[in-house]
Curated annotation (Swiss-Prot):
Lineage: Bacteria, Bacillati, Bacillota, Bacilli, Bacillales
UniProt protein name: Glutamate 5-kinase
Species, as recorded: Bacillus thuringiensis subsp. konkukian (strain 97-27)
Domain PUA: 276-350
Binding residues annotated for ATP, in chain numbering: 9, 168-169, 210-216
One GO term of the biological process aspect: L-proline biosynthetic process
Primary enzyme class: transferase
Amino acid sequence: MKKQRIVVKIGSSSLADSHEGISKEQLSDHVAALARLKEEGHEVLLITSGAVAAGFSALGYPSRPVTIKGKQAAAAVGQSLLMQAYTEEFRKYGIVTAQLLLTRSDFSRKEQYSNAYATLGELLNRSALPIINENDSISLEELTFGDNDMLSALVSGLVSADMLMIFTDVNGLYDKNPQKNEDAKKYYFLPEVTEEIASLAGDAGSKLGTGGMKSKIDAAKTALSLGVSVFIGTGRGQEKFVDVLKGKGDGTYVGNAPQKEMKMNKQWIALHSVVSGQIEIDAGAATAIIQHGKSLLPAGVTNVSGFFQVGEVVEVMTQQGRVIGKGQCTYSAEELRDVKGMQSQHIQARGERHSYEVIHRDHWVSL
């Protein structure tokens, strides 16, 4: 089996015990299986939930707290307990772990996004196993973030993973809730996430987690768009993750055909960047960009909205108001208003610029 880069996401329901916080038995089972992946020569990243579940009992809560302050207090206590438990278990296999706590802002800010990419790459080059969690104790987003499901998809795209394995307490995707419907049909393989499939998932999570099957389907759709195939399911024992790679996993495989990888900069533009303005373009420019993969030139710009600086991300729309994509603009809004509709040779005659693309195709994402 060739070396692969694997992101494994373990949810609260697959890790925690409702009475004791962290289930040592379940955690040991996961670590043993992750160690087997490493033993087979694969690069492994772990996205783990469970900080809130690990910490609430230590603070004297009888069950998972429902208030924001309670959840964040439990996470502040639980994150250190969770990481300590992982570190001790992985040490038995001679595996060095590294902790990364991320928030949504780490993805939306380009410099921090690039730093996360560089750090993860260096850790993998050094054979460490990164353990990643949302920074629950300060981030409100995590509490409605889908139990780290979307985080796992975004990380898998960032590191150009070969596969994302989302482990939960349900063995795959069904056309109905299998706990309530005996005739529920299981999907063993889905080539893509269609609107029909997305509509089948409910919103409810487990008692310990915040993410239901809907968040997992949304995460799978995002991962596929980034060139990463997905497995959603469950399992026990040391071979469970290796079995997934062999096609023997107890769950649903989603889009396991080779996917087209999206480069890091385009991932940031597509999924994380903040839109600072809008550019309206004519039909000829829209055709050149969408059908022929060309860069956007000033001649095709008909209107500029907003106040943005060089390098900021803008939406591009047709004269009919349809948004066709977004990209990093090489002009400020003020500069672009001055040259919109002008041919490149006329701008060149001014002697003001060396580059004339408004948005270069390498910094463009179609929507």
